[in-house]
Each structure stands twice: as C-alpha cells, then as structure tokens.
Amino acid sequence: MRVPTLWLVLLAIVTTAAPADELDVPDYPNHRQLMVWRDAAGEHPVKTPEDWAKRRAHILAGMQQAMGKLPDRSNLPPLDVQIEETFDGTTFTRYKLTFLAEGSDRVPCYLFVPKNLDGKRTAGIVALHQTTPLGKQEPAGLGPSENKHYGLELAKRGYVVIVPDYPSFGEYEYDFNADDYVSGSMKGIFNHMRCVDLLCSRPEVDPDRIGAIGHSLGGHNATFLGVFDERVKVIVSSCGWTPLHHYYNGDLKGWTSDRYVPLIRDKYGLDPDRVPFDMYEIVAAFAPRAFFSVSPLHDDNFEVEGVRQVIAAAAPIYKLLGVPDNLQVRY
C-alpha cells in the first residue's frame, strides 16, 4: 500500500474511534509484542497497515485510559496571542508572549521567527524544556546550560520555534487540582497541540513541516505530543524515555505526581504490568513519521537497555509501513 493511502486509513480509524472512556479496549498483557492486534475473537497477527491501524487506535485509547481523554478540539477558541516583549536578534526576532489554550488559561512562551525568509515558508518546531524552574527560558537560550539551548539553536538554523512553559514551571502558575484533567500529562498534550495550532497559523510556517523536540521532561512530552498530533512529522527526544519496567527498575512513583499521571498510582497500583500503555507502543505509533532518540548509556532515570528493547520491538512496524530509516537512535 502506498504511504498516502496508509495515512487515510490511520486518520479514519483514529478520528472515528470512540472516546477512551467509552471504547472497549482489548487487554494487551505484553506491550512489547507489537505485531498483534486483539478483539473479542482473540489475538490476530499484524500483517498489513490496516491491521496496524487497529492496534494503533488501541494504543491511543490505552494512553487515554491512564491519562484521561484528550479534550474535544472541534470548537477551539481563538489563540488570542498577546505579545509582552520583542527582542530583535541578528538572524531572528524573539517574541515573549502568551496565548489562550482554553477557558481563561493562558500559556507563556517564546516564539522565534527567522529573518530573511523572503516570503518562503520554513518548518515549525515545538521545543519543550526539562524539569527546571527556568522552564521555557532554558531552551530559549536564557539559562546557563548552553547545551540545552536547542530552541535558540534551531531558530538560528532558520526554523520558526515555539518554546512554552509546562504547567507549574517557569512563569506558568497552574493548579492541577482545580482543572478537569485526569493528568497533568494530558493537559501538557493539549497545550502542546495548541502550540502546533499557533505555528500553523503563522505565515512563515509550512504546516506540513512540523517537528517536536525536548530533553528529559521535554523529551517524553515530545513523544506524547507526537502520538496524539499527527501534524507533527518529526519527533526528537533526548534523555526522555524508557519502558516502564526499566524506569528505576519498575519503581513508577516518579510518574505519579499531579504534574504527570496520578492514575499510575491510584488505579494501577504502581504496577507496570497493569498500566495500559508503554513506550514500545508509543514509539511504534509514530510510524510512518520520523523519530530520533538520543539515549545516554548511563541515564539513571531512563535506562538504556530498555531503550534498546523498544527500538528492536518497534522496528518491524516501521518496516511494515515502508520507512525503516525513519526510526533512529544514538546511544
């Protein structure tokens, strides 16, 4: 099957699927086993892109069982961009701004717009920060760690880059107990999809060339965004992930604060075998889009052997969809 036809199949299944709390999602006891899909009749091999699209729909539903349902995006409010500061750089203009995510919730961010595009459109990038009180300042080049200034670096390379604060970091005050979200992770996904909305609204951005990049917290937030928003064609994660059994040897407490996924504790008892999704599925669900991971050999949080196992498990899916080279990792 040609890739354009495959995109139509995937889109149809994802967009017509029932909400996570209504969908009867089959149980997948082994998230590492990707070349199967399940229904009421039992387990079936994944032999075609259509088979994989069924499993992929189950992956998104499983994530929403743990994170809460992705809010309806059919009646989004205007972004209402409000610029607070403008910095005139040598090769770009940097705007400090807020935009309306939903209700009265405004997201603080930086937006880099290259100069001298001469009417041409360029790629748009969502650059997501690590766990740091600096929040968006660090990727934007306003923190002391130059090796984490990836938002600034990409802007210098000629891309339009948006660098948001994650809720409760930087200038983004947020009360997770006062919203309607089941998890902070789903709120982050929604906000980051709104960042993509903003990029796509810019005349300088080619909406078919959207990427996401992040380090640590930003690394797995880039993967979460990439699963749910198929406008994101390239996902880059640095020191950002490993499967649940390899995260501190299966000790999942670090995932359970209000900022992240509390149901991992409250519903699934901190048991990685009970959580209805894992990174094997997330990485495979990017296909046929491109995924690049930078995974260090001695990361205490995101253990590298787990990364190796995920890459090996996901590779057959990329091969099935005709894009084996779109899955890349550097150790």
Regions found by a protein language model. Give the residues of each.
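N-terminal pre-domain segments of enzymes
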Residues: 18-70
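Alpha/beta-hydrolase fold nucleophile elbow
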Residues: 204-216
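N-terminal cap/lid segment of alpha/beta-hydrolase-fold proteins
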Residues: 71-119
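Mobile cap/lid helix-loop segments that gate and shape the active-site cleft of serine hydrolases
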Residues: 234-282, 303-312, 317-324
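Bacterial N-terminal signal peptides
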Residues: 5-15
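Glycine-rich nucleophile elbow surrounding the catalytic serine of serine-hydrolase chemistry
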Residues: 214-224
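Cap/lid segment of the alpha/beta-hydrolase catalytic domain
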Residues: 118-204, 247-253
